[in-house]
Amino acid sequence: MASLNLGFSGARKKAAARIRAVERRNLITVCRFSVKTLIDRSCFETIDDTSAEFINFVSILEHILSHRLKGQVSWFGYESPRSFWDFIRMACSKVPHSCIHSIENMENVRSSRAKGRAWIRVALMEKRLSEYISAALRDFKTTRRFYEEGALLLGEEAGLLADTLIGLNAIDFSFCLKGEGLDEDCPVVIDYTPYLKFTQTSDSISSDEEEMRTLGSSGSEAGTPESHMAASLMADQSSWFSKSKRLEQKYRVVLEQRGYLEELVRLREAQLSESVSQNKALLQRLTDTEISHKLEKEQLEIIILELQDQLTVLKNHDLRSRQELTSHLTNQWPSPGALDGNAVALDTLLYRKRTGPWEEKSFPSLEQLSADMSLSQTSLDPVQLNTHSLDSKAGLAHWHREGKEDTPSLRGLCGSLTSMASYKSLASLKSSEYLASPTTDMTSPGLTPS
């Protein structure tokens, strides 16, 4: 039983799919007929709101745009009918220079149905109806959101619809958008009468001609020659009339196809020229970008070279500064010879102070001087510096015990020989007027040691 129900449901689904396919084919076929009728009518008169062909075309287009359109779900879960304007407003909002915003702001058009009808008229006057439909079909996500499965805009017939509407760009429409008649709630009805005309085929025409000839031949046996001639003339006239009708019909079809193809070619040429211009602009932009990148790369390479040169200069400068600092510190430290001379002068002075005041032409012996020199050399030894400092302090204490008066020139001798202040005080001792250098006295030509 379950399998039987599944079979019935599958059959119902297939039947519903076939019905939807038939609906789509019928709608697209009627739309093509309506477009051709509008093109034919536009050759003789201006198309406006009162034209029967235009009213029928608008009804067909509303049926196509409303085919299997989803309803709007309310807060309570009920589904209310929706107008196709909601879909057009969402799907065509990104079309450049669109009329969507101006229709939204129209004061005399308030309902969604009226705005949708106003949009159709404005798009026809702008000759952009096919462009709007194509843009809406490209937004497949929005189309799927607004239409159910099996809708014409979701099928293969949607592309045929956009191509069919291109032919309307050759017509100059003129409408009044005052809102009168746009808010009618009556259901739109498609009039199929103009498309149900009887068209005689070529086979039926030939059979009619054969029948006329047969009737003429049968009547000629019992009739006069005049009646036979009249029958033949009527047959010829009917044949020529039927031929002219066929030629006129073919001419109209070819003319319509030519207009359609010319409009299609113009549209494709416009699209091609636009694509070519966009391609040129992109190529120019790419060239400019490559040039700017190349210039930027060259500038960065120059900056890198300059930074490398500056880094080399800074390294060399740092090396020279280190060398200069090392030589400067080396030069500031006194040489061993200068230290020996200063030590000799200091030891000689201390020896003279211990033995008594200097007398003119009174000098120590050479043995004493050599002993003093050896003493001064040993005083520079870091191990014996402390001992020498203690001897100096003892000598100074001996001067105080003898009641000697301290002079400013002798106060610099109280420190240790290891400090820089003591070395500087030795230089001041040489220029003092109270102390004389023993080396100068010894090398004077007028004095001899006793």
UniProtKB/Swiss-Prot annotation:
SMART domains: RUN
Domain RUN: 48-180
Presence of the UniProt keyword Signal in the record: no
Transmembrane regions listed in the UniProt entry: none
Keyword Coiled coil: yes
SUPFAM superfamilies, sorted: RUN domain-like
Disordered: annotated span: 203-225
Coiled coil residues, start to end: 291-317
Keywords linked to the UniProt accession: Coiled coil
Family per record: Belongs to the RUNDC3 family.
Protein name, UniProt field: RUN domain-containing protein 3B
Source organism of the structure: Danio rerio (Zebrafish)
